[in-house]
């Protein structure tokens, strides 16, 4: 493999032996994030023969490197390093201890040896024991998605016929660090081969050097102008709104309850109290209408008599005052005011029960043993079954959500846009100074369209007046690289970008450090 100033690593299979010269080939991994870690073990040292520390990733490759001198195979320094490819884990460890709880994954490993293993669903399916004379100290472990390859100190120690991204990796260690984590993405590369061996690499990473070399399939250029095209990777998106704020009224579901005129009395016990008008809330906003209760008389809890709702801190008259539930169900029943509510809650027929009198006949039977055949005054019982939560809210009126819109225009780069409902990609420039003296009429007074119907110029109300913006194509068909003295020195473009210099009817952008790396 080839390393490029810690910014990339390049792998190629030993069977890949092209003729001398430049060749476009995969296998390059560009570093996109670097972090370090000093230690992750407790005061007693790290645990060997086990995976105890892991960091989550979603990457084509992850390299974990120790300082140049490496780390010793001991509980005082290095214990375990691993690569997680989601379906299986590859790890390297050592374990010379014996006894209960020691070496939980590998079992006892001979002294002065290390173990390279692969595990799937808790079962080891690959084991390789290597003497430490081959790897005197731990220096690096790299996980690569291509054929799920794992490299220990630069040597390929595991591969399979699957290609999967790295989902997690980590080094469990006590001292000898720090460990440097390098997260990489896969890119194509233009490699220079001599006698079947790669001597230099140029990444096709969207940089000026990469665009020029990978488009022309060579790293050697004579002086001149080189037209090029590139597809812009759009990373940003903005929206231009017609309104500064928008009100959205969310749906309020109404549950209306009414008196049941033909309800039959219970015949003894709470299980014979028939339920009516059961309504169950799902998620959202609800209004429960109990207006018919105005002709009923609420009966407070009095030992066995009346209502029973210690788990509900509200009355039915106030249930719509913004209470949160998850879930909520309400039913009506007609039963004895004497004991009907309390016994229903004890029997888990409801969380809370509210009793109301309508001066009904004494036709309802008792609910307690010994009173099942006795007659008591019938009343209206309202059963509420609920748990507190965040999916259901009661309200007296619909909920209105106000969204405040801010027009933040992204300039001088290719972006995805949504301008007054029209979407597309473009390179946005501010043309207020050029347009201010003209009378621009627009699509509803806000935009000018070109012949294709796409937005050409649009206007936004700013703090100090109207601002005009022009939408240009993301790709400049007139752009050219400038090579002088064998070096990439600049770009000619028709766009007036930040830092550019006017040159006749075009603009020149100087490239700093545009020299291609020398071949090794």
From Swiss-Prot:
Entry-linked InterPro entries: CoV_S1_C (IPR043607)
Keywords linked to the UniProt accession: Cleavage on pair of basic residues, Fusion of virus membrane with host endosomal membrane, Fusion of virus membrane with host membrane, Glycoprotein, Host membrane, Host-virus interaction, Membrane, Viral attachment to host cell, Viral envelope protein, Viral penetration into host cytoplasm, Virion, Virulence, Virus endocytosis by host, Virus entry into host cell
Membrane side Extracellular: residue ranges: 1-520
Glycosylation sites: 5, 33, 56, 84, 127, 146, 161, 195, 220, 230, 247, 254, 259, 289, 408, 430, 496, 513
Family: Belongs to the coronaviruses spike protein family.
The protein's assembly and partners: Homotrimer; each monomer consists of a S1 and a S2 subunit. The resulting peplomers protrude from the virus surface as spikes.
Protein name: Spike glycoprotein
Gene coding for it: S
């Amino acid at each position: 493999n080839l390393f490029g100033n810690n910014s990339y690593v390049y792998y190629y299979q030993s069977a890949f032996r092209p003729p001398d010269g430049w060749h476009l080939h995969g296998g390059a991994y560009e570093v996109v994030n670097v972090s370090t870690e000093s230690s992750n073990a407790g005061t007693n040292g790290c645990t060997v023969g086990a995976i105890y520390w892991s960091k989550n990733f979603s990457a084509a490759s992850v390299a974990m490197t120790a300082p140049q001198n490496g780390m010793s195979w001991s509980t005082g320094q290095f214990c375990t390093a691993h690569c997680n490819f989601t379906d299986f884990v590859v790890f390297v460890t050592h374990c010379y201890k014996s006894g209960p709880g020691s070496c939980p994954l590998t079992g006892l490993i001979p002294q002065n040896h290390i173990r390279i293993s692969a595990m799937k669903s808790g079962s080891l399916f690959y084991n390789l024991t290597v003497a430490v004379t081959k790897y005197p100290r731990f220096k690096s472990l790299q996980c690569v998605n291509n054929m799920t390859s794992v490299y220990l100190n630069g040597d390929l120690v595991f591969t399979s016929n699957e290609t999967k991204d790295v989902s997690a990796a980590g080094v469990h260690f006590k001292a000898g660090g720090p460990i440097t984590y390098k997260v990489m993405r896969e890119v194509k590369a233009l490699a220079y081969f001599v006698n079947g061996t790669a001597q230099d690499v140029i990444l096709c990473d969207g940089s000026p050097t990469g665009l020029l070399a990978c488009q022309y399939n060579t790293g050697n250029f004579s002086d001149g102008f080189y037209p090029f095209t590139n597809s812009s990777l759009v990373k940003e998106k903005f929206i231009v709104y017609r309104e500064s704020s928008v009100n959205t009224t969310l749906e309020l579901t109404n549950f209306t309850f009414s008196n049941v005129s033909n309800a039959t009395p219970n015949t003894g016990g709470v299980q014979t109290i028939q339920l009516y008008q059961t309504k169950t809330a799902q998620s959202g906003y609800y209004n429960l209408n109990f207006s018919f209760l105005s002709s009923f008389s609420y009966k407070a809890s009095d030992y066995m008599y009346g209502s029973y709702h210690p788990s509900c801190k509200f009355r039915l008259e106030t249930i719509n005052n913004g209470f949160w539930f998850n879930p909520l169900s309400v039913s009506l029943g007609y039963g004895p005011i004497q004991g009907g509510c309390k016994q229903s809650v004890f029997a888990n027929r409801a969380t809370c029960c509210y009793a109301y009198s309508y001066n009904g006949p004494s036709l309802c039977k008792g609910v307690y043993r010994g009173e099942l055949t006795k007659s008591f005054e019938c009343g209206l019982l309202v059963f509420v079954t609920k748990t507190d939560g965040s999916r259901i809210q009661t309200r007296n009126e619909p909920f209105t959500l106000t969204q405040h819109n801010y027009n933040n225009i992204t300039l001088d780069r290719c972006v995805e846009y949504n301008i007054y409902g029209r979407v597309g990609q473009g390179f946005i420039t501010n043309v207020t100074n050029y347009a201010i003296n003209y009378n621009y009429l627009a699509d509803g007074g806000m935009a000018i369209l070109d012949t294709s119907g796409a937005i050409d110029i649009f206007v936004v109300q700013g703090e100090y007046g109207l601002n005009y913006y022009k939408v240009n194509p993301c790709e400049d068909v007139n752009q050219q690289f400038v090579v002088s003295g064998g070096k990439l020195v600049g770009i000619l473009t028709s766009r007036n970008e930040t830092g550019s210099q006017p040159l006749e009817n075009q603009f020149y952008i100087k490239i700093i450090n545009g020299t291609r790396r020398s071949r090794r």
